[in-house]
């Protein structure tokens, strides 16, 4: 028994002794992940503000697009977004704060209450089967792709695909 323990200890020490201390990992990217995430946030922020006439947002609600969609006109400026919609009066606009941030991905979030967006994500009581249920609207979106002409978003909670086109 003592002989077996000695053999196992010698084998364990031999395995530890054969391990190399010169492990080097190859870099697949030119920059760190934090720097790439910050650069993507800055790029998306600039794209949102760069459209001179704003954006048309095709905003779909409901689980699996079950409740259809609405059109929102959005103009991003600094940290504020001004919106108009077919739900509001012809000359009425609504302003709120927004942010572009990096969580698990680059995200567009409408931070303060804006009834054109948040209405669909707040509990509706008798309007849904669940008294605490919502109409399936998001107010935080993952930015899937972004260019000067088109930004594709995906709702963080319900996963509906939202498209924004530059005007």
Features from the language model and the residues they span:
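Preference for solvent-exposed, low-hydrophobicity sequence contexts
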Residues: 157-167
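Signature of short aromatic-glycine-proline-rich micro-motifs recurring in repeat-based ectodomains
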Residues: 70-72, 135-140
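Bacterial N-terminal signal peptides that target proteins for export
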Residues: 1-9
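C-terminal motif of bacterial Sec signal peptides marking the signal peptidase cleavage site
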Residues: 16-20
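Helix-rich interaction surfaces within compact, conserved domain-sized segments
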Residues: 133-134, 143-145
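Short, exposed beta-strand-loop hairpins at the edges of beta-sheets
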Residues: 152-155
């Amino acid at each position: 028994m003592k002989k077996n323990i000695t053999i196992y200890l010698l084998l364990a020490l031999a395995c530890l002794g054969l391990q190399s201390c010169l492990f080097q990992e190859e870099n697949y990217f030119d920059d760190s992940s934090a720097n790439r995430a910050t650069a993507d946030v800055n790029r998306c922020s600039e794209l949102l503000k760069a459209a001179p006439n704003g954006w048309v947002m095709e905003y779909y609600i409901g689980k699996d697009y079950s409740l259809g969609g609405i059109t929102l006109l959005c103009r991003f400026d600094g940290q504020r977004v001004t919106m108009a919609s077919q739900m509001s009066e012809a000359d009425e606009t609504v302003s709120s704060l927004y942010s572009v941030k990096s969580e698990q991905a680059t995200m567009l979030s409408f931070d303060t209450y804006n009834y054109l967006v948040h209405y669909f994500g707040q509990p509706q009581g008798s309007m849904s089967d669940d008294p605490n249920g919502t109409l399936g609207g998001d107010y935080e979106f993952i930015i899937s792709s972004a260019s000067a002409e088109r930004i594709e978003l995906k709702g963080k909670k319900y996963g509906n695909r939202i498209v924004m086109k530059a005007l």
